[in-house]
């Protein structure tokens, strides 16, 4: 496995429901609320009295289920669903989840959000023992581990399998008589439990999906925890005691929808606090604040309230383009920036603009937006980022594969400022980020994973370790 060339990272959305006669349709609505987490493919798997049925395909959820018959056939009171964005594997339906596994004595489905850091080693070992993989993502590994376990009970098999996989993961599994969800020992990826008026139980990557189907949040799944949902109700269990909360800080910064709550913290509120703290750390004179739509608008509001500068709509987003960070190729990302934003000359002309954005990954978007604002007549553009400098890869489930593609890993703040063409560049401090999010916990770093900013990973990197250490010695120039 070569870390620089290929990673298995995914950023996806998972949803499941047990105990509702329209389970698949509600899963469709739930996935619609999670569409921002992945647009490459989607699928739904239903349970109709023990019979598992599935439809999946490439594209947006609405495209996958454009024919109503594909959803109508997914009858039953239980269902799981998945929206996918991935860097692993070919762009084919084989990699679209949920996966469905049929054996002579059982069948089950699986949906996964995250990335396994020991996937290559596990896959090699399993293949040497005769396992045959039908997809190229790491999500299939858990099913093989479950099936090959010698533990006599199903829960014993699942616990054993979960203890063998490492990294970041949120799994939802659908069996003939139950739905099971599990979270990694650090809770890198969020997973919440909700309940509907009729007693149906819902599991989702984000709480925003509960609102659209009328479910009430019960609680978030804890690190290392398993929830078993069947006709008898809800049962919580764990597969390890070696846990420590380190939820991905990028969920609060960028990925999650503003109306979602993660570990008791509303995402919009956290972003506003990030913006306010950013304003306190900002040291330049300016006339107006312009937030980059849409994920930066909450931070811009906080910046405005703290700084006293007026908030202006200096950038307009075409709502029918996809998010550039989760476009699968760099060429598409650059095209996406050109398509999705335009500057309002009547607002920014002759003004010193504070451009508030959530993050700088490759610098593609920032450079283009600064150019747009200056072409529209802004006299100065001061870029203020509502997160620390993103200088290290993520191995737990985000498409940040290598240091070579991170501008902050290869250039100083001043060099980055020059590359994007800004008059100044200010990043939020790591301490400011942790304080702004404010999870109530005594875990290190306020219960957050901030390894993308300081390189201090909360777990061993396993298969990635050797190549990652080597990459620390390499540099890539972003100057053009």
Regions found by a protein language model. Give the residues of each.
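Short, glycine/charge-rich flexible loops or terminal/linker lids adjacent to PRPP-binding catalytic cores
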Residues: 308-353, 364, 391-401
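Phosphate/diphosphate-binding loops
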Residues: 160, 208-209, 216-217, 221-225, ...
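Flexible loop/turn segments at secondary-structure boundaries
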Residues: 22-24, 87-88, 118, 188-189, ...
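Generic beta-strand/beta-sheet core signal
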Residues: 111, 174, 182-183, 194, ...
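Conserved short alpha-helical segments that host acidic/polar catalytic motifs at enzyme active sites
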Residues: 1-223, 228-286, 292, 380
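PRPP-dependent phosphoribosyltransferase catalytic core
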Residues: 162, 177-178, 214-220, 314, ...
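Secondary-structure transition/capping motifs at alpha-helix termini
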Residues: 131, 151-152, 283-287, 305-312, ...
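A short acidic (Asp/Glu
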Residues: 55-56, 183-184, 299-302, 393-395
């Amino acid at each position: 496995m070569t870390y620089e060339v290929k990673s298995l990272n995914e950023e996806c959305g998972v949803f499941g429901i047990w105990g509702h006669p329209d389970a698949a349709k509600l899963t469709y609505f739930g996935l619609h609320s999670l569409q921002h987490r992945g647009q490459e493919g989607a699928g739904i798997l239903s349970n109709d009295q023990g019979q598992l049925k599935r439809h999946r395909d490439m594209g947006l959820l609405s495209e996958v289920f454009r024919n109503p018959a594909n959803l109508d056939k997914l009858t039953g009171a239980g269902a799981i669903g998945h929206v996918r964005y991935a860097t692993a594997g070919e762009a084919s339906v084989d990699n679209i989840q949920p996966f469905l596994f049929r054996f002579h004595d059982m069948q089950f489905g699986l949906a996964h959000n995250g990335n396994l850091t020991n996937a290559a080693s596990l896959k090699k070992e399993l293949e040497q023992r005769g396992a045959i993989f039908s997809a190229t993502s790491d999500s299939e590994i858990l099913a093989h581990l479950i099936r090959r376990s010698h533990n006599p009970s199903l829960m014993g098999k699942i616990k054993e399998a979960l203890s063998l996989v490492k990294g970041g993961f949120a799994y939802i599994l659908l069996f003939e008589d139950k739905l099971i969800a599990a979270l990694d020992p650090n809770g890198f990826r969020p997973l919440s439990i909700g309940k509907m008026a009729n007693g149906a139980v819902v599991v989702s990557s984000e709480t925003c999906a509960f609102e659209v189907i009328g479910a009430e949040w019960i609680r978030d799944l804890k690190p290392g925890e398993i929830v078993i949902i069947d006709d008898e109700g809800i049962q919580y269990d764990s597969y390890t005691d070696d846990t420590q909360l380190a939820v991905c800080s990028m969920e609060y910064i960028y990925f999650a929808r503003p109306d979602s709550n993660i570990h008791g913290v509303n995402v919009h509120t956290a972003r506003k606090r990030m913006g306010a703290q950013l304003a306190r750390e900002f040291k330049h004179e300016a006339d107006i604040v312009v937030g980059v739509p849409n994920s930066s608008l909450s931070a811009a509001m906080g910046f405005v309230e703290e700084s006293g500068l007026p908030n202006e709509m200096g950038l307009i987003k075409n709502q029918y383009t996809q998010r550039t960070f989760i476009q699968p190729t760099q060429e598409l990302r650059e095209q996406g920036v050109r398509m999705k934003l335009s500057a309002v000359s009547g607002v920014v002309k002759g003004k010193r603009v504070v451009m508030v954005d959530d993050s700088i990954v490759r610098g593609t978007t920032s450079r283009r937006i600064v150019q747009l604002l200056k072409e529209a007549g802004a006299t100065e553009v001061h870029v203020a980022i509502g997160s620390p400098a993103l200088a290290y890869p993520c191995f737990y489930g985000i498409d940040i594969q290598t240091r070579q593609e991170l501008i902050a890993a290869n250039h100083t703040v001043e060099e980055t400022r020059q590359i994007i063409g800004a008059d100044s560049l200010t990043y939020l401090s790591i301490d400011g980020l942790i304080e702004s999010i404010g999870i109530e916990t005594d875990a290190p770093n306020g219960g957050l994973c901030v390894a993308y900013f300081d390189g201090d990973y909360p777990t061993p990197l396993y298969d990635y370790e050797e190549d990652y250490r080597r990459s620390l010695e390499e540099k890539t120039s972003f100057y053009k």
